């Protein structure tokens, strides 16, 4: 009987302040389940893509260990393969939005048990030009906060680190004049933020109604936030988003399978 192989792609900087013991517990569960286990750590940005692409065809299961970014990179690497393994996820990042959408436990051992005994499911994968994504592609306000929030702050503060960094953006909000064609519908306007996502949460800052987000329907959710003209407009937008009222205050919310975006 041929022993099945499982590869863990581990981002060691994700959740650095979290105890490492549970990761060893997860690895032990995989070994006890009969898998020949390999562990590869990322050392620089983009490593997860390379590791997944180089090793993915020679394994039965690839498990991404890190935050949403690590998962996204792992998927990007796997999408380059003709024969793709099964994918698992042990969330170790600061926000883990996509894991929450999938109801994956934040405890590594419990998440490993879900991988071993849970139901397999299909997921929509987005393609933006030549890049793949499973979680979100976005532009505008607050998008820089996920990149500029210091790793130490994200490890220590989690969601709060993104919120604090996002608040800095409020002083430098600038709208984007765009022309967007989504499934044949043309949208012209000035927007503060836009996202194409497959998650019930974006960057730990915005929540979408779980009843309106389906992760395997062949469509992503498009959210556009118009540029406010007055402080009152901004307040109304925030309230509409908090209350998930996507048909108010000029908000655009659609389920789309394809789109073309032009900016000025």
Where do the protein language model's features map onto the residues?
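Nucleotide donor/acceptor-binding cores
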Residues: 3-6, 85, 257
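Catalytic core of DAGKc-family lipid kinases
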Residues: 33, 42, 80-193
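Short Gly/Thr/Asp-enriched flexible loops that form oxyanion-binding sites at enzyme active sites
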Residues: 70-82
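Gly/Ser/Thr-rich active-site loops/lids in small-molecule metabolic enzymes
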Residues: 153-161, 201, 205-230
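A generic structural signal for short beta-strands and their flanking turns/coil linkers
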Residues: 174-176, 190-192, 216-221, 255-259
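ATP/nucleoside-binding phosphotransfer catalytic cores, i.e., glycine-rich phosphate-binding loops
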Residues: 182, 214, 224-264
């Amino acid at each position: 009987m041929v022993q099945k192989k499982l590869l863990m792609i581990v981002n060691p900087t994700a959740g650095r302040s979290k105890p490492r013991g549970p990761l060893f517990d997860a690895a032990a569960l995989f070994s006890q389940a009969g898998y020949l286990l390999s562990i590869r750590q990322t050392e620089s940005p983009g490593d997860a893509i390379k590791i997944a692409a180089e090793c993915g065809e020679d394994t039965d299961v690839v498990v991404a260990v890190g935050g949403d970014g690590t998962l996204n990179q792992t998927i990007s690497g796997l999408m380059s393969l003709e024969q793709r393994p099964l994918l698992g996820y042990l969330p170790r990042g600061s926000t883990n939005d996509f894991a929450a959408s999938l109801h994956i436990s934040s405890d590594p051992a419990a998440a490993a048990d879900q991988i071993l005994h849970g139901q397999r499911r299909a997921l929509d994968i987005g393609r933006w030009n030549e890049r793949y994504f499973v979680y979100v592609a976005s532009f505008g306000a607050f998008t820089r906060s996920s990149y500029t929030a210091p790793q130490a702050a994200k490890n220590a503060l989690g969601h709060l680190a993104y919120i604090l960094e996002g608040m800095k953006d409020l002083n430098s909000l600038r709208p984007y004049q765009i022309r967007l064609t989504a499934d044949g519908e043309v949208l012209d306007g000035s927007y503060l933020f836009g996202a194409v996502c497959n998650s019930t949460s974006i960057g730990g800052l915005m929540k979408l109604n779980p009843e309106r987000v389906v992760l395997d329907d062949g469509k992503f959710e498009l959210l556009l936030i118009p540029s406010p003209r007055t402080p009152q407009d901004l307040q109304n937008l925030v309230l509409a988003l908090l209350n998930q009222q996507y048909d108010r205050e000029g908000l655009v919310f659609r389920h789309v399978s394809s789109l073309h975006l032009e900016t000025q």
